[in-house]
């Protein structure tokens, strides 16, 4: 069992994790997110993604997970050294106490406790340079998506790509987030339609071995329902249900924004009937107009109905809500929690379960950009909501608490975070610069999307209007130009300095096959030409140069 009966997360950490080291996290061995579309990987959603070696996977397909970088991080964790890329957890743990006065529980505990004690002992005693098969895997086939959420970017959303291609890169952003919004992230889509993708090829080569031990396969995106490969996986489960030794034991999960048309939602519900253990993940953190503003593309009333349709008509073992806590969602986060409570009362405590994920990048959208009086207001509202839940102590029809202990612990962590932590991450710009970027970003966001910040967040208007920003005398020239104002063969090229500063210059590309790297050139004339569609960090952060990945 992952944890003993009635064992708290802190008790588990003391019993299992601490004896290994002060920085151990099983996710570095047993969990991965892999962006097959362009060849990026990470062991959880907090560190920046890093590149998969395209040459190494030719002889070792498991290197789409077992990269040299991860093996280095594993060695550090076994030695008790804190990898800098895992700073999210170190910030939580260094708070010393949560809002209940307990030792804070970071995500490395949550991401370790899901595995058996035997698995933990096995990886903790193996050579960190050895390859290991995953237990939980999240993959994305491409970035096709019908949403363009404010905290997302073109690397993950084709709708974001359309925004930047139509209007050009976002102007006048000065902090660490600039690299997210200055171009259409061409590296995230490096292969033409009929070109073989070596990362997808490696995945399928590893699959016969991997599928025997894998406990959960989770598909993310983009929006998975818009990719044919996802429906192919549903067919795999249907065809192998009775012949594959692990098909009925493996959880198959899909991360969906559930913003599809009714026909697509019905197709998903029908496809789930052929999966023995199907789990559905969706995202949300705010209600109504605010939720629609943050998650552009969302229609709040339709999304709620789609959640209900999936729970009533789908074969759903687990329904999970991923909350990305940002500066804007706190204005209605309590109402969103109330909506989830209502769902739990109707469908059971686990439908949905929720996770509270604190946004750090882009840092100007972090909750820590807010002024002290708003942070204190939201801190109080969340504390009162949680106190009410504890006082009522509601159970579902099976006697399970509507809000699980670990859900409460994540909320107490957020409550304390709003009170104690001052910067989203160690390379964050100063507060004035974050406020500047907050204002200039959302002014452009409104103009491009036909939205209205002031209507969506009336309690933030006074502060928002007080934010000072420097207007540009003329448009910046080092970012991607709007459609119609640039030559087809001219694109933005991103460079990241050792300090994490992003600079971009436009470069002229020769006509060549999409995805061709400069190592493949056969013409010395172009030997020094920047590589256009180059695989890179999935979110525009280079773990070797931004100070977050390694020593």
Regions found by a protein language model. Give the residues of each.
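Membrane-interface junctions of multi-pass transporters
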Residues: 18, 46-93
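Radical SAM enzyme [4Fe-4S]-AdoMet core and its adjacent flexible, acidic
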Residues: 1-42, 47-57, 100-109, 161, ...
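Long, low-complexity, intrinsically disordered segments
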Residues: 505-512, 517, 521-551
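Core AdoMet radical
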Residues: 134-144, 155-198, 211-230, 240-264, ...
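N-terminal pre-triad scaffold of radical SAM enzymes
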Residues: 30-43, 127-155, 214-218
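Short, intrinsically disordered, charge-biased short linear motifs at domain edges
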Residues: 9-14, 66-79, 133-140
